[in-house]
Curated annotation (Swiss-Prot):
GO terms for biological process: tRNA 5'-leader removal. Its EC number is 3.1.26.5. InterPro entries: Ribosomal_Su5_D2-typ_SF (IPR020568), Ribsml_uS5_D2-typ_fold_subgr (IPR014721), RNase_P (IPR000100). Belongs to the RnpA family. GO terms for cellular component: ribonuclease P complex. This is Ribonuclease P protein component. PANTHER family: RIBONUCLEASE P PROTEIN COMPONENT (PTHR33992:SF1).
């Protein structure tokens, strides 16, 4: 069985999410989340960083943590197909896996309510 790709890669789709998607801000974490429903049967994620975010090791670690937390929380998104973009904007951020996982759980539930209201 082929592994499903949960990454969002198309430049056109990314621009569309930034323009038409809904925004959730977390000022205490310097984090923004854009989301929009998609035409697929599964959800996808993109983790991006502002220009001032220094250190590739830290960027890649945070990206891996977000993707793993998202992968583990996919069962919560059963039946809902979303494209989600996280924008992290501060490099002195101390994000642990558990904080990202709890954040992801709350965001998924918040997205479900947002998508449910727009239908």
């Amino acid at each position: 069985m082929r592994k499903r790709n949960i990454s969002l890669k198309s430049k056109i789709e990314i621009q569309k999410i930034f323009k038409e998607g809904k925004l959730i801000r977390f000022s205490n974490l310097n984090l923004k989340m854009f989301y929009k429903s998609n035409h697929l049967v599964y959800s996808r994620i993109l983790v991006t960083f502002s220009k001032g975010f220094r250190g590739s090791v830290k960027r890649n670690r945070i990206r891996r943590l977000f993707k793993e937390a998202f992968r583990k929380r996919l069962e919560l998104l059963e039946g809902i197909a979303l494209d989600i973009i996280f924008v992290v904007s501060y490099s002195k951020l101390t994000l642990t896996y558990f904080s990202i996982e709890s954040l992801m759980k709350g965001l998924v539930l918040r997205c479900e309510r947002g998508i449910g209201e727009s239908k």
